Amino acid sequence: MLSITILFLLIAEGSSQNYTGNPVICLGHHAVSNGTMVKTLTDDQVEVVTAQELVESQHLSELCPSPLKLVDGQTCDIINAALGSPGCDRLDGAEWDVFIERPTAVDTCYPFDVPDYQSLRSILANNGKFEFIAEEFQWSTVKQNGDSGTCKRGNVNGFFRQLNWLTKSNGDAYPLQNLTKANDGDYARLYIWGVHHPSTDTEQTNLYKNNPGRVTVSTKTSQTSVVPNIGSRPWVRGQSGRISFYWTIVEPGDLIVFNTIGNLIAPRGHYKLNSQKKSTILNTAVPIGSCTSKCHTDRGSISTTKPFQNISRISIGDCPKYVKQGSLKLATGMRNIPEKATRGLFGAIAGFIENGWQGLIDGWYGFRHQNAEGTGTAADLKSTQAAIDQINGKLNRLIEKTSEKYHQIEKEFEQVEGRIQDLEKYVEDTKIDLWSYNAELLVALENQHTIDVTDSEMNKLFERVRRQLRENAEDKGNGCFEIFHQCDNKCIESIRNGTYDHDIYRDEAINNRFQIQGVKLTQGYKDIILWISFSISCFLLVALLLAFILWACQKGNIRCQICI
């Protein structure tokens, strides 16, 4: 094997040293055997040397608790946690960037509903903290701290921790309650209060004496008045009655007035609202792990620098934009034209017009030459750097255009708001369609620019060499120049680095050009002469044939008869 290799090298070296033709220098660009297809403005399939995937399709199987602070509600949703349901006491004072609600969360206290559920859920989630401030309420001649066997803490009957169930006094009285609380602080207060709906009139009078009862809650700018809806309902956790919870925000300088003759579930204080906090909520069954990521979805966290993702449209934090496409590739290299493999030892002397060079690995553009000293290949780093400088930062610019920090959470609506839900889904789908189209257009535009830039740098390099050589060489039309003077490796290097002196070789090149052209026709002139010669020969042959026929007819040797 060693002897065969040495013999091959000797043959290769000898063939180069025995080269007697004119020196040739060719310009080419880097290529690979298998490029990557990208989309441009004008073509859906353009092969480039290198490209970068922009759409993230992989996600972690867990939620990352850093740098965003996550609070796991476990069996408690955010509403039950705010009300103080049994089993949710551990969430008192909790603070979060993202509150994780689990699909398995359950109610553990008296059956209730929230007429404006989504709004209250959003207010609590955005607040980012359960900061409950207890207050003293002076309720007169009523019994406080009502409880229920449905709402046990351990083996003891209880109730929602942050609420006070008012019932008639032991003296069978429930007089009109009218209580005012002023907000003299510097922050907005959130009061959560409720109205009890008994299942029968008997239950109503047993609890509140007055039938019907009434609850009115007012501020300077709003008023909510509720009359209990007495009636039988399906049994839930041993109860057919219900509680409806409402909420009121009291701004600094405002006040809240509670007016009731029965059925009020009174607050024990208020939640401090933080207008500067921008937190949110995520409903998912994915567990919290120990990783690090700024982006969370309902399928898991995403750790990526890509500007787009097609994992989930529900995303929170500093996340890539959701697009429908599974792949968007950004060209980071030039157009790829794979090298032909059937040219022999120096068959790849062909220039960039025919195809690329797979051996040019240290630059995007370069030279190949053949002269009496042999053959060689060298990269042109100046042109390569010029192209790279224009392409570098392209991904960063693309990310800047799409890096708006936002969160998209899944909306929840009551059944009566089905039309609103349909409209919201339509708006979200339209927004995603628009973003997907914009992303595809933006990437195609950048790819078109990349290919145009790399092609332009190739042409600039070609023009630079052509202006240097001028009449000292002939452009072969395929990216190569035939040089009409002796050009050793030092001369070739001067052409590559731009220091070639045309005047030094001018006389020799002119003499050699005239000598060669005096005895040699280019392939184009040969073709013209061959066609002219063929045409004249055909014409003379036809003329001789016609002349012979006419002569034979005159002599009577040929008789022509025309029959009709």
UniProtKB/Swiss-Prot annotation:
It is found in: Virion membrane; Host apical cell membrane. Major glycoprotein, comprises over 80% of the envelope proteins present in virus particle. The extent of infection into host organism is determined by HA. Influenza viruses bud from the apical surface of polarized epithelial cells (e.g. bronchial epithelial cells) into lumen of lungs and are therefore usually pneumotropic. The reason is that HA is cleaved by tryptase clara which is restricted to lungs. However, HAs of H5 and H7 pantropic avian viruses subtypes can be cleaved by furin and subtilisin-type enzymes, allowing the virus to grow in other organs than lungs. The keyword Repressor does not apply. The lineage of its organism: Viruses, Riboviria, Orthornavirae, Negarnaviricota, Polyploviricotina. GO terms for molecular function: host cell surface receptor binding. It comes from the Viruses. This is Hemagglutinin. Belongs to the influenza viruses hemagglutinin family. GO terms for biological process: clathrin-dependent endocytosis of virus by host cell; fusion of virus membrane with host endosome membrane; fusion of virus membrane with host plasma membrane; viral budding from plasma membrane; virion attachment to host cell. The record marks R343, G344 as: Cleavage. HAMAP family: INFV_HEMA. It is a single-pass type I membrane protein. Palmitoylated. Residues 1-16 form the signal peptide.
